[in-house]
C-alpha cells in the first residue's frame, strides 16, 4: 500500500476535526466502481485494515462508515470470500455499512448479513436528483418488515442514499416512519399522512393519497428518469439515457388525484400547497 495514504488521511482528518469537531464517524468508500489492484482476499483485508488503522491514529474512537454499492455493482467480482476478508479485517462494530440500494437488491441477504458487521437498510430511490413520482412502496414496506425480523442482531437501522435532496418526499417519509413504528398498517399511515399535510381530517385528501399509494407509487425510480421538459433538445426521441420520460402509471389517474386535491378546499397549509403544485406539474 502507498505509505502516503495514511499520512494524507491523518492530516486531512486532523484539519477536518479542527474545523468541524467530530462525531467519531468517518466515511471512506474504497473501490467504488473501481477495481482494486489485486482481488486476493489477503490484499483486500490488508487494505481495509490499514484504512481503519489510519483513522484511529487521529481518533481512537473512530467508526468507519462504508457504503456497499461496490458489492452490488460488481457482485460478480466481489465474491463472499472477498467480501468477508475485506469486512472482517476491521474490528467488530467499528465498521458501519450502508446497504445502498435495498429497494432493488438487498446485499445483506447475499453476504450472510455482512458477516456480523453492523449495517443500515437503505432506500436509494433517486438517481441524479430526478423529481419523478416513483417508488415501490408496498415492496419496500415488506422488505423493511423482513429485515427487522430476519436481519440479524447487527442490523442497526434504516437509512437513505438518495442522489438529490428535495425530491419525492413521500417515499422518504414512508421509509423513515418505519424506524419509529414498523407495525403501523399502511392504510392507517396513509390517512395520518394526508391529515398532517392538510392540517385536518379531510376525506378528499385521504382519497387522493390512497390513490397515489395504490396506483402511482408502485414501481421504483429508474436510472435517468425525468420529463422531456428537462431534456436536452433533439430532433428525434429523447436524446440519450439521461432522460427517460416513460412513467409506470396512467396520467388520467394522476389527473384524478389532482382533482381530489383541488376539491379538498381552500387551505393554506404549506404541505398541502406543495402537493397541489407537485402533482399538477407532473
Regions found by a protein language model. Give the residues of each.
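Histidine-centered catalytic/metal-binding microenvironments
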Residues: 229, 234-282
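Ligand-binding clefts/hinges and TM-proximal coupling segments of bilobed small-molecule sensing domains
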Residues: 224-228
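Catalytic-core regions of glycoside hydrolase
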Residues: 1-213, 218-222, 238-243, 247-251
